[in-house]
A protein has these predicted regions:
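Extreme N-terminal starter segment of soluble prokaryotic enzymes
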Residues: 2-4
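Short beta-strand-centered segments at strand-helix junctions
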Residues: 6-8, 13-53, 60-105, 110-137, ...
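Acidic, glycine-rich active-site loops and adjacent beta-strand->loop/helix elements
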Residues: 146
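Short coil-to-beta-strand transition motifs
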Residues: 149-151
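Short beta-strand-to-coil "C-cap" segments at the C-terminal boundary of structured domains/repeats
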Residues: 187-189
Length: 189
């Protein structure tokens, strides 16, 4: 591996509960897997929703499987565009976060909290963490090897035997670093 980490751009997306899915798409609806993602068991869905704020709306894909709570992950540019608050948080840390409306073909849901801008993070297995000399929840810096090399600070390491090695950044961060196509980064101390 030699400290080479695949960097993936995570575009705006939504995680929904089974209850929200049925309100948006109809009773008994299940998510349709369009494409498996790099993290085992995660997938992009055929289903899309409209994310509405006081200043506008954006289309976003749903990622599966369903979750215990609704979560909307936007870039800060997306959040400003539609007029919603999106604090920078780790996935799942939604208490007191932003609000929006989700609209689907069969109904809408008010998300009272759940809008975030995802904190930069690296998924890795315990073996990856041992090889890279890092631990779960550690904060690291990562240099991207692109046409506009950039060192991202405040990157949280997430370790689980259910993960595959990959760093996730949002579209704002990706654009700043020209992180297009297959991009790799390395942890710098």
């Amino acid at each position: 591996m030699a400290n080479k980490i695949l960097v993936e751009t995570s575009a705006r997306h939504v995680h929904v509960t089974a209850e929200t899915l049925e309100i948006l798409f109809g009773k008994g609806h299940t998510l349709t897997n369009k494409k498996d993602l790099s993290q085992p068991g995660q997938f992009a869905c055929e289903e899309k929703v409209t994310v509405k704020g006081p200043k506008g709306a954006l289309k976003a894909s749903i990622l599966g499987p369903t979750r215990p709570a609704d979560q909307v992950e936007l870039s800060l540019t997306d959040a400003r565009t539609i007029g919603v608050v999106a604090p920078v948080r780790e996935s799942g840390d939604i208490a007191g976060s932003g609000a929006c409306i989700l609209e689907g073909p069969c109904g809408s849901v008010e998300v009272k909290e759940g809008v975030i801008a995802a904190k930069r993070h690296i998924h890795m297995t315990p073996a990856d963490a041992a090889e890279l000399g890092v631990s779960d929840k550690e904060i690291v810096n990562v240099k991207l090897d692109t046409a506009r090399p950039l060192i991202f600070g405040d990157v949280v390491v997430r370790v689980s035997d259910k993960f595959a090695l990959a760093m996730h950044i949002d579209t704002d961060e990706s654009n700043a670093a020209c992180a297009f196509g297959e991009v790799y980064g390395s942890i710098v101390k």
